[in-house]
From Swiss-Prot:
It is found in: Cytoplasm. CDD domains: CMP-KDO-Synthetase. It comes from Nitratidesulfovibrio vulgaris (strain DP4) (Desulfovibrio vulgaris). Pfam families: CTP_transf_3. This is 3-deoxy-manno-octulosonate cytidylyltransferase. The gene is kdsB. One of its GO terms (molecular function) is 3-deoxy-manno-octulosonate cytidylyltransferase activity. Activates KDO (a required 8-carbon sugar) for incorporation into bacterial lipopolysaccharide in Gram-negative bacteria.
Length: 252
């Protein structure tokens, strides 16, 4: 009998996108974007299985041609996290197993980030983990960059689009406040992932438009792992050229 699988990487990939329809199929160096994400993810030694989760037959067909494991999910989900949960259910993931939500629009993702993200689960008390990196004072001014404040034990105190922590005294524009920018990669114990999908959207979540606040408001701790690795997502077609340059630099 084979050993039970304990760590899954799931890549949500939906076809519909207001800014970039068909984004998972966008050509990058001769292969669709989702393949590059899968290729990066499978380099993470912690994963027992990596699979695509999609609602679209065109993406599923392309995945099958390229030998990428694929799970078909419902078309309508409130978030990518809900799609990941459905895929994990279909894969029969055990409650104590770890499920990593790997953003499908991060084709230049450094696999070492995934290793860092999964590492805290050696502690059986950890239920959710995410990544953060140092921000300059200038970067922290943008509401598009989500900030996180971390407790002494490494758990998140709060996430915000505002510049936190606020520096009341001293050089407000300086870099001495230890600002951290959130990186939107999450790992969950399966039971915590299920709990997240069962909870209604919370007050702070709706205020900030940040779904991770649903966890904090309901007493579910999020372990924050610092990283120095950078990545670049694809929001619009013009981002593809940036990704191609990054891939050539990293793999050249």
């Amino acid at each position: 009998m084979s050993a039970p699988r304990t760590c899954y990487g799931i890549i949500p990939a939906r076809y519909a996108s207001s800014r970039f329809p068909g984004k998972p199929l966008a050509d990058i160096l001769g292969r669709p974007m989702f393949w590059h994400v899968y290729d990066r993810a499978r380099r993470c030694a912690a994963f027992d299985e990596v699979a695509l989760a999609t609602d679209d037959a065109r993406i599923a067909d392309a995945a099958n041609v390229l030998g990428v494991p694929c799970v078909m999910t419902a078309e309508h989900h409130p978030s990518g996290t809900d799609r990941v949960h459905e895929a994990a259910m279909r894969l029969g993931v055990a409650d104590d197993a770890v499920v990593v939500n790997i953003q499908g629009d991060e084709p230049a993702l450094d696999p070492r980030m995934l290793d860092q993200l999964v590492a805290p689960f050696a502690d059986a008390s950890v239920r959710v983990a995410t990544l953060a990196m140092a921000l300059s004072a200038q970067e922290a001014q943008s509401p598009d960059r989500v900030k996180v404040v971390v407790a002494a034990n490494g758990d998140a105190l709060y996430f915000s689009r505002a510049d936190i922590p606020f520096v009341r005294d001293g050089d407000v524009g300086g870099d001495t406040a230890g600002r951290l920018g959130h990186i939107g990669l999450y790992a969950f114990r399966m039971e915590a992932l299920r709990r997240f999908t069962q909870l209604p959207p919370s007050r702070l979540e709706q205020t900030e438009k940040l779904e991770q606040l649903r966890l904090l408001e309901n007493g579910i701790a999020i372990r924050v792992v610092p990283t120095t690795y950078r990545t670049h997502g694809v929001d619009r077609p013009e981002d593809i050229d940036v990704i191609i340059n990054l891939l050539r630099e990293n793999d050249g």
